[in-house]
């Protein structure tokens, strides 16, 4: 374990990283009521009722097995809207696999990580209950030292299709379940390690001087040795932390931008562990309704991107994610909104290194309340947002987003979610993020002045930008001239819907965007057609819509509304976007 290995190797190459992806034993149940007792026991015999399933993979994508049904719905909940309850006939899957632990590793702290499981899960190891977690698109981590032994160990999970958290995950997408991101064990030092860290930078004297601060959360009584290396390989500073803090002052910092994504290497050494942090230095501010990056006015030329693959569902291979970003670069896209949930953690590493502006979105949408219950439109839409019993669930989603992604320079806006009305719980999310860093920019579209008028009270305190969806060009002009905007820049989090032969009006929008500094740009809805590919009987695949699997409710062909086909072949509209951007 040394600095050289840390600088050159991926996580998969570390001996302290144990990947558990691969074939797992799996059994599907149409209802949790039918789940047999004792499946989690250490000596449970896996019988012929179990199949093999690939992890990561949504169980609905095992089309030949008939586990459940792929279901595409936009805003309608796929079950009766009665929070916090979900149907008793709740489909679920049992996952079982054995894994080995080396005896030497028992002297380290062992952390089992799940980067994405939809919608919730219960976890056992060697017959003992370890814990429970939900929030589908966020990492869940468990210390498993009290549950494992040297040699073979049995891991068992019960994953439910729906839970109370599903009321906050009503995104426009194919509804799919199971383990859809990586599973692995981290083997951490007990004698001394970095539990967490937060790197911030402050620029002074017209960007000629920089103060880099690192707040460390340490395990053990050791301080941290550090070394800072410039993007060009020059050693800037080295030393040791004091009381868990590092402060580095240096001249002529090299700034990060989407066009010139230069990153410093910060090496943190606790003797038993070495951590490499890729640090970007930027100055992002809003001044007099204008968005500035490093003192220059910037425009967001963005797209909304879902995790979607025609063969793998939400279990999008990381190579496929990288290819998406290359496609963006080839089409002059400089910004990505992670609609409508956090992406794979490595996505932001790629955005840091390739140069993208990221609107990083919480895993939160409650769109179905706008249509599924009685009452005034905005009041019912904001039902959970104004319910104190849901406050901690909202804050939890903001906290887990921010703490996971806080060290990524590519993030320009922290988004509180999508289409969930607006209420006190959104304000609590905003307040939490600002308590961690008062200088970051927080985004939420349902806090714009149109919704304040509908709600009969001002909602704009939980968003630093005036964000709208699909306003006409004339409406944009009205917004830009309105005092109701409260000196916030106008940003279109969704515009120019790309369904069919769209988007056809990009040029007209960008004439206005380019003519007004208060208009900072927008993100086209959306990047890719969502579809499940099925064999056509002739050795090829055909793409499906909502309802093609008998799924109800469904939103039909509204899932194919992207700039590219499911296989990423560009539509003609993407060529127009490339030209305009």
Labelled PLM ranges:
Residues 1-19, 25, 32-35:
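N-terminal pre-domain segments of enzymes
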Residues 1-10, 53-55, 62-65, 73, ...:
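Extended substrate-binding grooves/exosites of carbohydrate-active enzymes
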Residues 19, 92-98, 109-111, 139, ...:
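Intrinsic-disorder/low-complexity, polar/charged segments enriched in Ser/Thr/Lys/Arg/Asp/Glu/Gln
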């Amino acid at each position: 374990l040394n600095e050289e290995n840390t600088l050159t190797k991926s996580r998969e190459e570390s001996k302290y990283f144990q990947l558990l992806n691969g074939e797992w034993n799996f059994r599907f149940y149409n209802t949790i009521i039918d789940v047999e007792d004792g499946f989690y026991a250490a000596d449970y015999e896996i019988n012929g009722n179990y199949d093999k399933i690939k992890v990561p993979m949504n169980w609905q994508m095992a089309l030949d097995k008939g586990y459940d049904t792929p279901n595409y719905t936009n805003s309608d909940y796929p079950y009766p809207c009665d929070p916090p309850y979900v149907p008793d006939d709740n489909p679920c899957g049992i996952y079982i696999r054995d894994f080995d632990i080396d005896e030497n590793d028992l002297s380290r702290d062992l952390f089992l990580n799940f980067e994405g499981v939809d919608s919730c899960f219960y976890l056992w190891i060697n017959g003992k209950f370890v814990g429970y977690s939900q929030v589908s698109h966020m990492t869940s981590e468990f210390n498993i030292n009290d549950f494992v032994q040297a040699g073979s160990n049995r891991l068992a999970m019960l994953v439910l299709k729906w839970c109370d958290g599903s009321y906050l995950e009503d995104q426009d997408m194919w509804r799919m379940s199971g383990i859809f991101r990586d599973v692995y064990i981290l083997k951490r030092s007990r004698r001394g390690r970095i539990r967490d860290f937060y790197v911030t930078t402050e620029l002074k004297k017209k960007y000629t001087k920089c103060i880099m601060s690192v707040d460390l959360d340490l395990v053990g009584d050791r301080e941290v040795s550090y070394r800072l290396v410039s993007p060009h390989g020059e050693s800037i500073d080295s030393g040791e932390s004091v009381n868990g803090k590092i402060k580095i002052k240096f001249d002529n910092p090299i700034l990060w931008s989407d066009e010139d994504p230069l990153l410093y290497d910060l090496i943190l050494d606790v003797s038993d562990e070495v951590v490499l942090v890729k640090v970007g230095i930027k100055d992002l501010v809003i001044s007099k309704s204008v968005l500035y990056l490093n003192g220059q006015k910037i425009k967001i030329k963005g797209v909304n991107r879902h995790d979607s693959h025609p063969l793998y569902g939400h279990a999008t291979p990381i190579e496929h994610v990288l290819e998406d970003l290359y496609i963006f670069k080839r089409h002059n896209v400089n910004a990505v909104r992670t609609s409508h949930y956090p992406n794979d953690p490595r996505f932001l590493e790629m955005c840091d290194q390739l140069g993208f502006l990221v609107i990083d979105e919480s895993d939160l949408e409650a769109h179905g309340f706008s249509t599924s219950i009685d009452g005034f439109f905005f009041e019912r839409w904001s039902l959970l947002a104004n319910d104190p019993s849901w406050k901690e669930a909202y804050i939890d989603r903001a906290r887990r987003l921010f703490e996971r992604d806080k060290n990524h320079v590519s993030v320009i806006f922290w988004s509180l979610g999508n289409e969930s009305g607006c209420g006190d719980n959104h304000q609590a999310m905003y307040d939490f993020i600002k308590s961690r860093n008062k200088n970051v920019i927080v985004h939420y579209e349902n806090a714009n002045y149109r919704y304040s008028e509908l709600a009969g009270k001002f909602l704009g305190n939980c968003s630093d930008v005036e964000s709208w969806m699909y306003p006409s060009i004339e409406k944009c002009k009205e917004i830009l001239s309105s005092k109701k905007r409260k000196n916030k820049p106008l940003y279109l989090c969704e515009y120019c819907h790309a369904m069919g032969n769209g988007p056809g009006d990009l040029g007209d929008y960008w004439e206005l965007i380019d003519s007004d500094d208060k208009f900072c740009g927008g993100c086209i809805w959306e990047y890719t057609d969502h579809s499940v590919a099925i064999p056509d009987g002739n050795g090829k695949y055909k793409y499906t819509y909502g309802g093609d699997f008998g799924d109800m409710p469904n939103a039909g062909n509204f899932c194919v509304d992207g700039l590219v086909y499911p296989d990423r072949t560009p539509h003609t509209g993407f060529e127009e976007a490339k030209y305009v951007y």
